[in-house]
Amino acid sequence: MRILTVLLALMAGATVAKAETLQTAIFAGGCFWCVESDFDKVEGVVETVSGYTGGTLQNATYRNHGEHREAVRITFDADIVSYDQLLYVFWRTVDPTDAGGQFCDRGHSYLTGIFALNEAQATAARASKDALRGRLGAPIVTEIFPASDFWDAETYHQNYHQKNANRYNYYRTGCGRDARVAQLWGDEAPFANNH
């Protein structure tokens, strides 16, 4: 019985330690299906959830999301991947020079954005944005905001790239996302044409 108690205590300690290394990031990068798909490929990402953030409407939905942007809440293991590494991936999977949306998706809900959950994330996001100035031949228009309420998208949007792979790939290719990302970032584009 004593050994069982010790083992349970050790396992509980490991669970608490693991929980402390789990962190959250929120990125808006146009269509949340694509953002979710890209970050699901990153080692150390534990979960991605598509949703809406940045607006004021309560209980946002796809049909009624007000001034929210499509975004993805990312849970990651900071022992495996850092927030700075996620920022690197984010920038290189979007067109941060597009002030009208992303790729074929136009309008406010498809604008890019970084939603910082604390001052450390805000500082890292600003530094990563500053490091890109002058690299792409146009101003970086992606905004950095303090995180606000995040409303999970409807169930059919979650893991869309897995549940509806053919439709998703047709959409992604037709929208020109990978072609534009490859044009902007070249060899630095981690997932262009990798779907």
Task: Write out the residue ranges for each language-model feature.
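Bacterial N-terminal signal peptides
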Residues: R2-A14
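Flexible coil/turn and secondary-structure edge motifs
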Residues: K18-H195
